């Protein structure tokens, strides 16, 4: 479970935030962003020593000042249910389009330089611009352009 998905789910729930400087903030999470900046409402701020309290209607806390967050257990359970549900909805890896050809060895030869004489070459020559047996003798190049 990722911290940001936990915070997104915790919107509207009460939480405790402790900052690196020791202050704590108790309030209801309104919003959070990708930098873990959070917006709380109905906040009670407690000083580092725990002897001073402030009540604020709302506050904004910068994400890099946060030491830890205490989130209700119901939110954690909800996030775990959502992640397990989304994992069960996914296809297993390697199923569907885009995971290789799947028919290697069933068709003769491919295209390009790596093709040999006997495995799918039309008139020999091994591909565009290559001489060789049955090719254009001493003429270099692919037969296009000047020269």
Curated annotation (Swiss-Prot):
Residues 2-75 form the Sm domain. It is found in: Nucleus. Residues 79-147 are annotated as: Disordered. Pfam families: LSM. GO terms for molecular function: U6 snRNA binding. Residues 79-92 have a biased composition (Basic and acidic residues). PANTHER family: SMALL NUCLEAR RIBONUCLEOPROTEIN SM. Binds specifically to the 3'-terminal U-tract of U6 snRNA. Belongs to the snRNP Sm proteins family. This is Probable U6 snRNA-associated Sm-like protein LSm4. It comes from Oryza sativa subsp. japonica.
């Amino acid at each position: 479970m990722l911290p940001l998905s936990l915070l997104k789910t915790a919107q509207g729930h009460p939480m405790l935030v402790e900052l690196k400087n020791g202050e704590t903030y108790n309030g209801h999470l309104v919003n959070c962003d990708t930098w873990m900046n959070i917006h709380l409402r109905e906040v009670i701020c407690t000083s580092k020593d725990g002897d001073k309290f402030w009540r604020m209607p709302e506050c904004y806390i910068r994400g890099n000042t946060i030491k830890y967050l205490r989130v209700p257990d119901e939110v954690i359970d909800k996030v775990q249910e959502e992640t397990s549900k989304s994992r069960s909805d996914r296809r297993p890896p390697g199923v569907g389009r885009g995971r290789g050809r799947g028919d290697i060895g069933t068709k003769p030869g491919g295209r390009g330089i790596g093709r040999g004489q006997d495995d799918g070459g039309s008139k020999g020559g091994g591909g565009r611009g290559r001489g060789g047996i049955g090719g254009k003798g001493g003429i270099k190049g692919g037969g296009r352009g000047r020269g």
